[in-house]
Structures are given as C-alpha cells and as structure tokens.
Amino acid sequence: MVIINAATSVRCLYYSRFAHYLFSHGLDVMLFDYRGIGASRSGSLRGFEATWSDWGALDAEALLKRAQREYPGQPIDVVGHSFGGCAAGLMASGQAIRHLVTVGAQFAHWRDYAPAQRWQMLAKWHGVMPLLTRVCGYFPGKRLGWLEDTPSGVVKDWSALSTRYENLPSARNFAALPFGSVTAKTLAISLSDDPFGTVAAIERLLGYFSASSRTHLRIQPQDIDETAIGHFAFFHSRFQGSLWPIALQWLKEGELAVDVPGRTVSFKAPSPQPSPGEG
C-alpha cells in the first residue's frame, strides 16, 4: 500500500495520474487532502485551525493507521512531495513505513532557496504571504494563482525563519519529533532546477531521518533529455517513462536501477543540532 503525502496546499487529485501509474503496476494507493485543502475543506478558512504539524501528526498519521486497518499484512510505503516528505517524519506510527520516496522534500528554510531566486522567494513566501494572511485570516492563494487557499497556522510554519523544524510554531508542542522512529529505506529525489529543493534543503530534512538508510538522487533535466522539471512537474504524465519508474522501483524493491538517470549525492548532513541564537 502506497500513501501519497501532498505538497503544501496542493490537492491530492494533482497526483492522480501518478497514483494510477503505480496502481497499474500492482500497487494499491491511497490519496488524501490535508485538513482545510480540497475535499477536506468545509467553508471559510478564516479562523480555521491547521498547521504543518497537524497535517503530518494527525492527517497523514490517520491515513497510515487506516491503511494498516484496511489492508492488514500489506507493507506500507510512502511518497512525499515537498512538505509531504516532512509529513512522513511527523507520524507517530512512522516506524511502520517500509520504503519512503520523497520528491523535492524540505521545510522551506529561506537560506536553502536557490541563490538566483532566493530574495524573490523570501519576499513572496516569507513577506507577502504572511502579510496577506494577517489581513485576510488565511492565505488567499487560489485567488492569486499561487496555490490553494491556506490556513493561517500553516503559513506561520512555512514563513518562519528557523533552520530547525522543532523551532517552527506548531512543532513546539512535540515532546520529541517522531522522525527518528522512521527506519524506512529512504530515497530523496531532487531536481537541479527546483529552487526549493537545493542540495542544502534536501539534506537539511534528510538529517532528521537519522534511523533510515538514506539515498539522495540528484537529477538534471538534461539527464532525461528535457529542458525543465522544477518543483512540481515530476508528477506530470509526460515523465511516466523517465522519472516515474525510479519511484516505482524504489517502492517495490527499495533500490535504484543500475541505469537510473542522475547522480547519487554523498549524504553529509548530520542530525540537526541547535543553531547559534536558536533554542
């Protein structure tokens, strides 16, 4: 059974073509919307309480428990896109995950953004987004064409400037973050033209999965004869023959094919330690 954890404020239907591909290759798949998003939204988000930590510790955890109930005996695998990879480490039952594939997974520390876009992204996601959220009571992302409307608690987490997840507003309620209980074979896929998913960003998150065997595969568009992939396009059906088999192979076997495109990056990030001035 494969659970797909979506990116921040992305409807689960975005991943339906990828889910169908996995199903056509013999894997059962579960999709879900985080609270306040898509089919899990009911009415206005003004005053609606939801955070990144809720999405992982409550929503993703609930799907994992449901998979265990409804498909007893089946191994549980997870695909996490962007924040969805972080959500996999926030589940109390994360030790049940067999194989984990993340795509562009990080928690948006601004210094990790690609240098060419860093200041623009800092202004957009850490300036304009929280400002509009304070005015509206939620982030009206759909009206702007940026993403789905987003609960204010999620915006507070995303726009925080900390280098460590445990210092984000919603994470302070954890006695200890559950990341270290995940023992899954973990493949982190990053794309060289993804301004969110730089090597530093991917490894900042990977450092939390301290009990997992971790492989970081870095792919350039030219590795698959493309000009661009970016943060979202991995899940577009045009990559069914080039990128999707990488995830499928890992979900089934927990290993990379011999002829996989890209290069593996030597994992160097330590388990996160306190930064000066943070506590």
Positions of predicted regions on the chain:
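Short alpha-helix in the alpha/beta-hydrolase fold that links the catalytic acid
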Residues: 184, 197-208
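Short beta-strand/loop motif that positions the catalytic acidic residue
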Residues: 182, 188-190
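Alpha/beta-hydrolase fold nucleophile elbow
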Residues: 70-82
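Alpha/beta-hydrolase-fold enzymes
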Residues: 79-166
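Active-site glycine-rich loops that stabilize anionic/oxyanionic intermediates
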Residues: 5-10
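Alpha/beta-hydrolase active-site loop
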Residues: 49-70
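Conserved alpha/beta-hydrolase
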Residues: 12-45
